[in-house]
């Protein structure tokens, strides 16, 4: 893609294309110092800048970080946020991550005081500075009222039950004729955080969105003021789902469904009051990343985990099992649960005498797709963490809606057993032989051609896209789109409309040798054959002069009948012609904007399972992905054509 008017400035790591292995040869500390100098020399987004306070030094925190944390967070091939990105966070956000969030497994080795020291060392701020979050301004009484006449029009995160992410033109209100009229209407920023992974829901005149610091906001759709806010226990990274009601029915009690890292919640959509919460799995490394899926009176949630993220020889690896749990949506009563692997058994001992367990893994990273006609759901699974491997890892699986029984399995990659011990070179923790880590991160799509034919589409980190028969699980076609890899291929970007499949590829260089070139970009395939309709590859040129910039598409896509809407990892929001791939409109999400609270903020890359949401001529965009080497940000942008 083009540089799109940006001035020409070389970006270290990006412009020079330093390989991961070369980065290690340079030395991680020296590399981070160079990145820090170059990064801070440029204007950082105001939304993610820490308040100007007297910096503090915490030597005890430095010692703890060096001993327990640096190996991952100072590894340039890791997805773990670098110390630079962690330094932007609010100190209480780091403490929460170590206590209740994704790092709670590592945090078990730390006392409450130790966690505070680590947070203060990284942020150079005291835990009690009182500057952790700047909430959007509260609505006036007239703007706070829930609008029962404005019913939700999307079924959930996947927009349709089949996860097509297809918004009809009449609902989107956005076409090739008016897309050039898009202009920023308002923006909300959330200080002290560095990413937004929660795809918003819209209903009742509100935008509902979750934040990294665990707050669910109800924002007035027209003004951006906060109607209410709800504190969850940890980061909200899932999409938000709202139950339907009849237009104008003020007796209705619509509920919101979402998950933080370990709990599923149901809230009253009008007031934000908690109706129920459930902890779906007692495994200590459980991590909820898939948006809940609401179908009729049942709520489905996939189970993923952080168990593959590395541990020690003293940890009994591995025992987590991926799966799906079904709840009665109004009460939270569990209806059934179905696992992707059998219960683990002891498989011997490791070098220090710790029990080894298997099978494990086959996590469900993204939302299930619902097949109304066949009364089944489809999930994608990840790799196994320990040997022996199973026939359900790296698979698309069909389950019966009524009881979760597995109806068929299509396994795309056999014998993929992997954990981050392989990434760090910890051979005693890495399964032998080492698998390629080719998860299905993108949610499966049940796509319907204009002829009426149904195909289940799966997209994998291997770079392959698959067309599968929904009745039998038999492969119809497969197409290699990206090079793939541990951090590459297709992560979340998969959508379909009419006879086309749209795929976003990130293809980040993970340091592994490959004869294939990286192929980040946007691609369109024929739904029935898998053949290319068009290709829109990205270029490294788009990153010249941009800090923490990597070309490609990591986040989920949204499509209309005419257009493909893609938030890119280089910080640009782009809208393409669905028929040709031609660029119709673009916006630099890293540019500073004035928020409804009066402050200055900006976004960054887009990543994870979030996507832009078009509705009634508006476009709602959560932006910022402070992970690994992606640009941080924490802003919701709302554009309008009117």
Question: What does each model-identified segment do?
Answer:
Residues 46-64, 135, 142-143:
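Electrostatic cytochrome c docking/interface patches
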Residues 138-184, 340, 345:
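Blade/loop signatures of beta-propeller domains
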Residues 171-192, 350-352, 539:
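A short helix->beta-strand "capping" segment at the edge of beta-propeller domains
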